[in-house]
Amino acid sequence: KISTGFTPFAGNGFTXITEYGP
């Protein structure tokens, strides 16, 4: 599982805490 609380790449829609994958 990958958890992000930031925008990893410009243009992606990640702006919050996102969890995905194993």
Swiss-Prot record:
Record key words, sorted: Chloroplast, Membrane, Photosynthesis, Photosystem II, Plastid, Thylakoid
Subcellular location: Plastid, Chloroplast thylakoid membrane
Highest taxon in the source lineage: Eukaryota
Induction profile: By light.
GO BP field: photosynthesis
One GO location term (cellular component): photosystem II
Family in the record: Belongs to the PsbP family.
Chain's role: May be involved in the regulation of photosystem II.
Name recorded for this polypeptide: Oxygen-evolving enhancer protein 2
Species in which this protein is naturally found: Physcomitrium patens (Spreading-leaved earth moss)
